[in-house]
Regions:
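Short, acidic, metal-binding catalytic loop of nucleotide-sugar glycosyltransferases
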Residues: 24-36
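Short beta-strand/loop segment that forms part of the nucleotide-sugar
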Residues: 36-46, 63-65
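A conserved acidic beta->alpha catalytic loop
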Residues: 41-51, 94-95
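A short, glycine-/small-residue-rich helix N-cap motif at loop->alpha-helix starts
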Residues: 66-73, 79, 129, 151-153
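Active-site nucleotide-sugar/metal-binding loop of Leloir-type enzymes
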Residues: 76-86
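Short beta-strand-to-loop acidic/aromatic patch adjacent to the donor-nucleotide binding site
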Residues: 85-95
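Conserved donor NDP-sugar-binding/catalytic core segment of glycosyltransferases
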Residues: 98-129
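C-terminal catalytic/acceptor-binding lobe
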Residues: 153-223
Length: 223
């Protein structure tokens, strides 16, 4: 039997309210048929999450942002600090069906055997909760796959535009086995909403300039 390659699964989380969901998310990953998984939880400015996850979960890595830095920073931090052949960017309110990662890896090996592409784990035609290879990560400066102009919103949408333009985007054929996303109206979502207008303004400015992260590497906030 061919040895499974490692998949690092990045899970940012900021609200203690979601600890039960976070634990459920990780356990659904570990219960899957694809076993060579490495969940990395980013406790985003929340020491309580760091302590609870470290004590209650096995075979995971938990890291702490000393202050809240939000989604884009947290995902990019793991991409910079953890070596892996493949990565999945996820969230703390998902359920991974049993064969989800296995089927997604099969699709990756069929569509992009060198890992230079994104396979969606979401059920909608959006670049959300995707699997990509280390070669894809190395395409980006400082391994920042998610455009650092943004804080929380819009970066995955811009990534969708990039992978479609490059023809490096695919779905597994087994769409029914992709992740379930709860999309709760809770503290995490309320915190994110505070910067939604800011991120959308950046999105429009980048569109006006014709910027597309991954096609080019232009930034507005660092000019």
């Amino acid at each position: 039997m061919k040895e499974e390659t490692k998949v690092t699964i990045i899970i940012p989380t900021c609200s203690s309210e979601r600890i039960p969901l976070l634990i459920q998310t990780v356990k659904s990953i570990q219960a899957g048929t694809y076993k060579n998984v490495h969940p990395v939880i980013v406790a985003d400015g929340n020491k309580d999450i760091y302590d609870v996850a470290s004590k209650q979960l096995n075979n995971v890595t938990v890291i702490l942002n000393k202050k809240r830095r939000d989604w884009i920073f947290s995902i990019n931090r793991v991409l910079k600090e953890f070596d892996s052949e493949y990565y999945i960017y996820a969230s703390d309110d998902l359920i991974f069906p049993t064969d989800c990662i296995k089927n997604t890896m099969k699709a990756m090996q069929k569509c992009f055997p060198d890992g230079f592409g994104v396979i969606s784990l979401g059920k909608k035609n959006k670049c959300i909760f995707g699997l990509f290879g280390n070669k894809w990560v190395n395409h980006f400066p400082n391994r920042e796959v998610f455009c650092p102009d943004y804080i929380h919103y819009c970066s995955d949408g811009e990534l969708l535009g990039t992978v479609k333009k490059l023809k490096k985007f695919a779905f597994p054929p087994e769409r029914e086995s992709q992740v379930q996303h709860f999309r709760l109206n809770d503290e995490t979502r309320r915190l994110a909403r505070k910067i939604r207008a800011r991120d959308r303004e950046i999105w429009h400015k980048r569109e006006e300039k014709g910027y597309l992260w991954g096609i080019d590497f232009n930034l507005i906030t660092r000019q």
